[in-house]
């Protein structure tokens, strides 16, 4: 991170498996110095927290992409879940996601099975990026593939590695990616679906008698009542505010100067399946059966 070994170089294909959750405090000075170069360096979009440098590797890969008039590039990089959603609107991670999505660089994210790495069993994801989407069916789209259940158990674990992705699974994942169709484990979204505007909702400050506190004739916000809402980019903020806020707080208003655009990819939410709770009658019948069984067991004990 502190010493670009491929300065000025670009590549057709880039594969990367950066460390998960690795601090970059030791490289902070040089990284921040390069960030001042904007997109003339590797880190123009923003900087993540020093506790996790994954997205610095992601931006490094993006900076090595060939211009589209020279054939463009494709990237596959493995991350844990953190780069998908960490960071509020306006933060470094959110701004990095914003740069990727608003420039239509993200082709797909593939959720891998747990327990496929020696040192960790956490969830991991392959990000597939390309600057060659324009004019194709993928233009303006992102494909999410949930391959979490596509694995075979190892006969013997190696550290945390208990599962393998078989050749057949790899072929199937590749086919799903190539087909670019929606299914139970493949969903397709617009780039904009992952964006939102974080609005600040204010309520007026009132005195002990409930009267408005005014300053130069203007209502003053009560900071103790301040709240925020994330409004999807595809929604009109005014309509959202009138529907979701005003019915519950008729005196509220939006401080537009504080609005910020953010991006996140809550992957698991898109594949969540609601499971209805068991009927109460079924649960009660099971409890009665257990009580009957317990009563019989107690009788046997005391008969002894």
Predicted ranges, named:
Residues 1:
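Phosphate/diphosphate-binding loops
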Residues 4-299:
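A conserved structural/catalytic subdomain of Rossmann-like adenosyl-cofactor enzymes
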């Amino acid at each position: 991170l502190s010493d670009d070994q491929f300065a000025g170089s670009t590549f057709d294909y880039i594969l990367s498996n950066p460390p998960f959750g690795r601090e970059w405090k030791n490289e902070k000075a040089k990284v921040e110095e390069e960030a001042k170069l904007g997109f003339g360096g590797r880190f123009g979009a923003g900087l993540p927290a020093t506790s996790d440098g994954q997205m610095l590797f992601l931006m490094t890969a993006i900076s090595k992409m060939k211009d589209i008039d020279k054939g463009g590039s494709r990237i596959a990089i493995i991350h844990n879940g953190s780069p998908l959603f960490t960071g509020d609107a306006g933060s470094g991670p959110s701004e990095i996601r914003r740069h990727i999505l608003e420039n239509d660089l993200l082709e797909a994210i593939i959720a891998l099975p747990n327990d496929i790495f020696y040192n960790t069993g956490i969830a991991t994801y392959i990000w597939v990026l390309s600057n060659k989407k324009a004019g194709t069916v993928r233009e303006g789209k992102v494909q999410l593939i949930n391959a979490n259940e596509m694995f075979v158990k190892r006969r013997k674990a190696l550290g945390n590695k208990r599962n393998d992705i078989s050749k057949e699974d790899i072929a199937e994942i590749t086919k799903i990616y190539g087909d670019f169709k929606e299914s139970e484990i493949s969903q397709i979204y617009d780039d904009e679906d992952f964006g939102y505007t974080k609005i600040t909702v204010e309520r007026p400050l009132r005195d002990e008698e409930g009267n408005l506190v005014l300053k130069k004739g203007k209502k003053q916000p009560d900071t103790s009542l301040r709240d925020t809402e994330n409004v999807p980019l595809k929604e009109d903020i005014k309509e959202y505010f009138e529907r979701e806020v005003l019915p519950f707080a008729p005196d509220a208003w939006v401080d537009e100067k504080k609005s910020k655009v953010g991006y996140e990819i809550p992957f698991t939410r898109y594949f969540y399946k609601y499971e209805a709770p068991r009927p109460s009658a079924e649960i009660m019948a099971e409890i009665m059966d257990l009580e009957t069984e317990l009563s019989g067991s107690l009788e046997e004990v005391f008969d002894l």
